[in-house]
Amino acid sequence: MGAFDVVVLGGGTAGVHVALEAARGSKSVALVEAGLIGGESPYLACLPSNSLLLSAARGEAWEDAAARRDDVTGGLDDSAAALRLIEAGVAVIRGTAQITGPGTVEVVSGAAAGEIVSLAYSDLVIATGSEPVAPPIEGLSDIPTWTTAEGLCSPDLPRRLIVLGGGPAGCELTQIYAAFGSQVTLVEAEPGLLPGEPAFAGEILATALRRAGAEIYLGSPATKAERTPDGLTLALEDGTRIDADRLLLATGRRPRLTGLGLDALGITVTPGQALPTTTSCQVLGPEHVWAAGDVTGSTHTHASRYQAGVVAANICGQPREADYTAIPRCVFTTPSVYAVGEPARPEFATARVSLSEVARGRLGLDDLGCLELYAADGVLAGAVAVGPDAATWMAEVTLAIRAKIPVSILADVVHAFPTYGEALQAAFRELARVDQTEKGIGPLSELGMETPEDDAIEQHTEVVADEVTTAGRRELPFDVDEADAAEQARSVGFDDDDYR
């Protein structure tokens, strides 16, 4: 029997990072994984999806995009990832693990034709990830289907594709295959795309996907699937019938916990439910048992990495708790979606800015984009943005929520012109104005701070000067009189509403 300070079950993002950090903390570590070291994210999910989306944006042919994707994912070769662990001192064991009791695990080796390896541990980390969930649709097992992983690593481009599920993965895959010429139909049982996010985000994304050529059915679940001579037919509850060559299932995932032997530790888990954990990522019940990643119900790669750091710190004697108030939620479509923190609530102050209201929004070809910020008691609580590369210019919001920075401070932050950050600037100032009004302090201008109206005039002035010059009508002086900005705008064909 091999004895280790730490045994990690699962070699995905969470498991790998726990193992590396624990090894750096002078712990002896064994990691058990039956599949790819590194998990699905770098091979079958996030990286191939983003690779294909970027190739689509560049206008590449499918063959070139697929080749680039395969290069990015290393051809599903995890030897480099395994070597990194080994060089860090981690014992990598290929096989399927089962907990046999407190402090012991048995591994059926995948490398030694079923040999059983016994391991002893002081701390156990469960990081076995998640698996796709197939919906209860009559006839589903009789038709050609893809999981999201199969859809992202396929060498083939289907002529007609149905994507079932309008969450982040379903929307990304819809845009990918529509961009490369497939006839794509997206079906979502809920009334809108991206269930759980504000309706405006799903509405904007639906508009973008329809413009890309996708057909979208909302609010009617699929009830029956039938194989046909040409492929398949999917029937919806409202009577709609859709023909396709293949059905891609993007209908969610569940924690992969079956067969682990959790009952040997006195842990009872409802099928499909996450492992209950403390804020220290310790599994409720037995001591020295930890969990990180999808098994906890947190389905984002960056959240898995964060939890792994919390687990490793606690195992190494450095008490740490996880704070989930600012975990980003991203959809890497065009336009992209970035959400963080709490959703809108009636008691929250809300600021909403269309990206077309800032100068940068007038420079792009995409007219779709909007930002909403939510604040409570003068502190930012949540945010949702839809727009070009939203994840890049919304990162400061994540920091603001995590650090509980007052909106009065955020409102005084200077953003470069012309950037989408100016949409944040306008929203911060609106939230600060509401906060000051509620506290009876007075307008921002009395505090020596620009108001949202001041900002709008400045944007109006700068854009008008730029547009007039670009139009070749006449050069305006560098110092444009703000009082004349609206009149000058009208003189070159702009309405006052263009900058509101």
Task: Report residues per predicted region.
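Rossmann-like dinucleotide-binding cores of NAD(P)H-dependent redox enzymes
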Residues: D71-D78, C153, P158-I162, P168-P229, ...
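N-terminal Rossmann-like dinucleotide/flavin-binding domain of flavoprotein oxidoreductases
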Residues: E21, E40-Y121, E197-T223, A344
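Glycine-rich dinucleotide-binding loop and its adjacent helix/turn
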Residues: C46, T128-Q183, V187, E215-I216, ...
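FAD-site-proximal beta/loop scaffold in flavoenzymes
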Residues: S141-R159, R241-N314, A400, A411
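N-terminal Rossmann-like FAD-binding beta1-loop-alpha1 element of flavoenzymes
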Residues: F4-L31, G170-A179
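Mid-to-C-terminal Rossmann-like scaffold of FAD/NAD(P)H-dependent oxidoreductases
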Residues: G2-V16, R24, P198-F200, R211, ...
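Glycine-rich FAD pyrophosphate-binding loop
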Residues: V7-L9, A23-P42, S182-L193
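A Rossmann-like FAD-binding core segment of flavoenzymes
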Residues: A91-R94, Q98-A112, L119, F180-T279, ...
